[in-house]
Design a protein with these regions (language model features):
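Alpha-helical interaction/dimerization surfaces of two-component signaling modules
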Residues: 15-20, 99
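Acidic, metal-coordinating helix/loop segments flanking the phosphotransfer/catalytic sites
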Residues: 28-54, 118
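Active-site residues of response regulator receiver
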Residues: 57-60
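Short amphipathic alpha-helix used as the core "switch/output" element in two-component signaling
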Residues: 66-81
Length: 140
């Protein structure tokens, strides 16, 4: 799942995933508020309820009540960390990256028009994130 307010980036991201044969079902949401509501639907009391396996959250989502770091904090606090989750952003601010680690983000991908090499590197590490054995990593 991609949570990002830039519709053009939705297309760039989907194209890169397609080129890499990533077996991800892409659902693009435009705001952290919308994503928070969807997570409430995905994580009911039923543990067998289907939920996203991987979530890419934009750091700065225009028109949202809170940023990507706060969304990750809410998801991990309210729903547990049952999925791979991290930030995708053009920012390389070390303070923001540290905040993301603290709230439970597993990765940080630097956003660009040529996102494919970063996603390819991310996919090599994916099993470690699923098994909670992979270290936090910034993909530049």
């Amino acid at each position: 799942m991609l949570i990002d307010d830039e519709n053009l980036f939705h297309l760039v991201f989907e194209d890169a995933c397609s080129l890499l044969d990533m077996a991800l079902s892409i659902e693009a949401l435009d705001s952290s508020d919308e994503a928070n509501e969807r997570f409430k639907e995905w994580f009911p009391d039923d543990p067998n309820h289907e939920k996203p396996e991987c979530v890419f959250v934009d750091l700065n989502i225009i028109g949202s009540s809170f940023d990507g770091i706060e969304l990750i904090r809410k998801i991990n606090h309210e729903h547990g960390n049952g999925c791979v989750i991290g930030i995708i952003s053009s920012s390389e601010d070390e303070e923001e990256i540290d905040k993301a680690k603290i709230v439970g983000a597993q990765f940080w991908i630097i956003k660009s028009d040529d996102i494919e090499p970063r996603l390819e590197e991310f996919m090599k590490d994916y099993d470690g994130y699923v098994n909670k054995t992979g270290p936090f990593k910034v993909y530049r």
